[in-house]
Curated annotation (Swiss-Prot):
<comment type="function">
    <text>Transfers and isomerizes the ribose moiety from AdoMet to the 7-aminomethyl group of 7-deazaguanine (preQ1-tRNA) to give epoxyqueuosine (oQ-tRNA).</text>
</comment>
<dbReference type="Pfam" id="PF02547">
    <property type="entry name" value="Queuosine_synth"/>
</dbReference>
<dbReference type="InterPro" id="IPR042118">
    <property type="entry name" value="QueA_dom1"/>
</dbReference>
<keyword id="KW-0808">Transferase</keyword>
<comment type="similarity">
    <text>Belongs to the QueA family.</text>
</comment>
<keyword id="KW-0963">Cytoplasm</keyword>
<dbReference type="GO" id="GO:0002099">
    <property type="term" value="P:tRNA wobble guanine modification"/>
</dbReference>
<dbReference type="InterPro" id="IPR003699">
    <property type="entry name" value="QueA"/>
</dbReference>
<dbReference type="GO" id="GO:0005737">
    <property type="term" value="C:cytoplasm"/>
</dbReference>
<dbReference type="GO" id="GO:0051075">
    <property type="term" value="F:S-adenosylmethionine:tRNA ribosyltransferase-isomerase activity"/>
</dbReference>
<comment type="subunit">
    <text>Monomer.</text>
</comment>
<keyword id="KW-0949">S-adenosyl-L-methionine</keyword>
<comment type="pathway">
    <text>tRNA modification; tRNA-queuosine biosynthesis.</text>
</comment>
<dbReference type="InterPro" id="IPR036100">
    <property type="entry name" value="QueA_sf"/>
</dbReference>
<dbReference type="GO" id="GO:0008616">
    <property type="term" value="P:queuosine biosynthetic process"/>
</dbReference>
<keyword id="KW-0671">Queuosine biosynthesis</keyword>
<dbReference type="InterPro" id="IPR042119">
    <property type="entry name" value="QueA_dom2"/>
</dbReference>
Length: 371
């Protein structure tokens, strides 16, 4: 594939967006979000059709395989009181051994090594935490928790009692209903600090309708982590590195994909996290999908040939983000920006609680399709 030199520049993935187009609330029911359907290559304009997510079932075939991400968002945001006075927030990310956890802190400049923090809740005994060190790679803080919260299972109990679901910073509100609405209906494996948002559109009714049509379903796990909060800062994308995220692709997923290929079905990823999980596992297998459990830091951008994924249901992503690069790898950068302009013109809602885009396998660049 011959790339336009601009494809390797971060500034080429910018686009103007009115803040009013950023969805602050989810729609109900889930499947009533709008759906931009990308026209197959070679078709006459327009470049897209407009529908609702409920209509997506008309685009799928019996024998297709949907790959969902079953991660569950932790209540990973903690509000703490600083010993010197004032409040702060911690976003708990990952273990750092012996009861220590890497956290993003706000305001970070007031969270210094040695500072004591107090975690408080109505009717609960305060819990003492301590900032141990700064983490230069992430910009976060390593925080010491009490020894009886040393492992993930124990910490999850603490987060459930004291924490809140960490909505993205562009959602300027908080409501108790987000604890349920910012989860997919099939979220079952706790570990993420952000939702795999394409899956938020899949209601129980839509999943049942797809099943009745003969569409198959399998689930991978990718715990969305620090990378989702970190903007891409490298203008030269040939040197881009991403923070790794924990992935598990089980044997039953491999078997489901093989069976899908055998019946000439299509592998459809629900969300970019499912793409990264499948493609990361295939990379570990030398280009062939295999079971996998471990960190994945795969960069997918224009020029990438997919090994597993044929089509994609995805949300609309932030300008100059790694997710925008991934979707550009499927349809081409200029074409994707034209599709985003179409969505903006037609008043689509953007980002986590926003609307969706369907990229049919016939809309994927030929050079990017699995061999």
């Amino acid at each position: 594939m011959v790339l336009d030199p601009r494809d390797s520049l971060l500034s080429s993935y910018d686009y103007p967006l009115d803040p009013e187009r950023i969805a602050q609330l989810p729609v109900e029911p889930r499947h009533s979000a709008r759906l931009l359907i990308v026209q197959p290559l070679g078709m006459k304009p327009p470049i897209a059709r407009h529908a609702e997510v409920w209509d997506w079932q008309e685009e799928l075939r019996a024998g297709d395989l949907l790959v969902i991400n079953d991660t569950r968002v932790l209540k990973a945001r903690l509000r703490v009181r600083r010993s010197g006075g004032g409040l702060a927030e911690l976003l708990v990310l990952e273990p750092r051994g012996e009861g220590c956890w890497l956290c993003l802190g706000r305001p970070a400049k007031r969270l210094r090594p040695g500072d004591q923090l107090w975690l408080e809740a109505l009717g609960e005994e305060p819990i003492a935490l301590q900032v141990i060190s700064k983490d230069s790679a992430s910009g976060g803080r390593v925080v010491q928790f009490p020894s009886h919260y040393a492992n993930a299972e124990q910490l999850e109990l603490l987060l459930e009692r004291y924490g809140e679901v960490p909505l993205p910073p562009y959602i300027q509100r908080h409501d108790p209903s987000d604890s349920e609405r910012y989860q997919t209906r099939y979220a079952s494996r706790p570990g993420a600090v952000a939702a795999p948002t394409a899956g938020l559109h899949l209601s129980d009714e839509l999943l049942e309708a797809l099943k009745q049509r003969g569409v198959m379903l399998t689930s991978v796990t990718l715990h969305v982590g620090l990378g989702t909060f970190r903007p891409v800062e490298t203008e030269d994308l040939s040197h881009l590195q991403l923070h790794s995220e924990w992935v598990e692709v089980r044997d039953d997923v491999v078997e489901a994909v093989m069976a899908c290929r055998a019946r000439a079905g299509r592998v459809i990823a629900v969300g970019t996290t499912s793409v990264r999980a499948l493609e990361g596992a295939a990379l570990a297998g030398g280009g062939f999908l295999q079971s996998f459990c471990g960190p994945v830091d795969l960069v997918i951008q224009p020029g990438y040939r997919f090994a597993v994924v044929d089509g994609l249901l995805t949300n609309f992503h932030l300008p100059k983000s790694s997710l925008l690069l991934l979707v550009s790898a499927m349809v081409g950068r200029e074409r994707l920006l034209a599709l985003y302009a179409e969505a903006i013109e037609h008043q689509y809602r953007f980002f986590s609680y926003g609307d969706a885009m369907w990229i049919d396998p016939e809309a994927v660049l030929p050079a990017a399709r699995p061999c």
